[in-house]
A protein has these predicted regions:
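Flexible helix-coil transition and linker loops at the boundaries of alpha-helical arrays
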Residues: 130, 169-196, 227, 265-296
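TPR alpha-solenoid repeat register
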Residues: 141, 175, 236-238, 272, ...
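Long, ordered, amphipathic alpha-helical scaffolds
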Residues: 73, 78-96, 272-294, 299-342
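Residue-level recognition of tetratricopeptide repeat
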Residues: 137-141, 172, 233-235, 299, ...
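Short coil/linker segments at helix-helix boundaries
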Residues: 90-121, 126-130, 151-214, 248, ...
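Alpha-helical repeat scaffolds
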Residues: 162-163, 218-225, 251-266, 287, ...
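"A position-specific structural signal for the A-helix of alpha-solenoid helical repeats
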Residues: 144, 201-202, 206, 240-244, ...
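Extreme N-terminal leader/anchor segments
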Residues: 1-126, 134
């Protein structure tokens, strides 16, 4: 296998870990989750009339008859098949056989983008709400309203707007993109340089933050894999999330394998020096079984997270890895010692 394919394999997604509700059930149990939902709903969902109305709405709404990976549609959402979307997707073959997917905006969608820019420049939230009534699946409007809801402290509404944006982009994508999300070779790739694609990056990144606020670390990590796999040059700096979330979610073995695969990929086109070195740093790297050449040198979090992951797996090289992290980032070690009152 090539370093590229090995890294892509490490980034393959598990659909069951994409839904935060599954992680909450594993943490607290299904009964506790249902009780919390009934409490938030004031007992209304338990009434037969409410259930029947909701079921009728679900039967009439085509959104509920579609299998999705990125979110679970709600019967209260506008029927996407009866609404204007204005997005499609193209695929381009890259050298080496890799396939890159890109969203495309129609002329009418671009006009909606112009109206969105006017609404944002007015600094009036009601202008965005009015625009959403006309274009209920306009992605940038949904993302902006999600940000407004988050600033107001309504995380539930913020998450609902994010889910709607992701649903619109998933439904407008080609079937190969949707099926490739859970492929064993990793999610499809997208071009971050295309402005039409950046709304997807923004929606996924905000989802990571939202899931982290809820304490669903495993779900957040899975979405980090998706965002990093879209473009492994990491334009959103998602590695700064992975070091924290991998430790919090106890995915220690995966994290160590990912770091090795990432460094092998980034150095696959570089020629290693054949002359042996006898510096103190090289001796520490040898003792820590550290074969990386650059991934850990720039990132404080990755260096210390690797040492912590080795300690969590009871590896004998964990102490040497911690010493190496301190040598690489001495200022961070001083701050940590101050926090620990050492």
């Amino acid at each position: 296998k090539t370093p590229f394919s090995v890294l892509r394999t490490q980034l393959c997604l598990d659909a069951s870990h994409m839904d935060p509700a599954n992680e909450l059930r594993r943490q607290f149990g299904a009964a506790a989750i249902k009780a919390s939902e009934r409490e938030k709903g004031g007992g209304l969902p338990s009434r037969a009339g409410s259930r029947s109305r909701e079921n009728r709405g679900a039967n009439l709404n085509s959104n509920m008859r579609v299998r999705t990976v990125l979110c679970t549609p709600k019967p209260t959402w506008p029927d996407l098949n009866r609404s204007f979307v204005g997005m499609s997707m193209t695929t381009d073959e890259m050298p080496g056989g890799a396939r890159v997917c890109n969203w495309v905006h129609s002329r009418a969608y671009k006009q909606a983008q112009f109206q969105f820019a006017q609404a944002v420049s007015s600094y009036d939230t009601q202008s965005l709400v009015a625009l959403m009534r006309v274009f209920p699946w306009h992605v940038d409007t949904l993302l902006q309203l999600s940000a407004v809801s988050r600033y107001q402290g309504d995380l539930g509404q913020a998450g609902d707007f994010l889910d709607r944006a992701l649903f619109a982009m998933e439904r407008s994508a080609v079937p190969t993109f949707v099926s490739g999300l859970t492929s064993s070779s990793g999610p499809p790739m997208c071009d971050f340089q295309r402005a039409e694609n950046r709304a997807f990056w923004l929606a996924v990144h905000r989802n990571i933050d939202l899931f982290g606020r809820r304490g669903t670390w495993r779900t957040s990590l899975e979405w980090c894999k998706l965002l990093f796999a879209l473009d492994m040059t990491d334009p959103h700096g998602i590695l700064l999330w992975i070091d924290f979330l991998a430790i919090k979610s106890r995915q220690l073995d995966w994290f160590l394998a990912f770091i090795d695969a990432l460094d092998a990929y980034r150095n696959s086109n570089k020629v290693a020096l054949e002359t042996p070195s006898s510096s103190s740093l090289d001796k520490l790297k040898s003792a820590a079984h550290d074969t990386t050449h650059g991934s850990l040198d720039w990132s404080v979090g990755l260096s210390f997270a690797r040492a912590l992951a080795l300690r969590g797996t009871k590896a004998p090289s964990s102490d040497a890895a911690l010493s190496l992290a301190i040598v690489r980032h001495p200022r961070a070690a001083i701050l940590l010692a101050d926090k620990l009152d050492v």
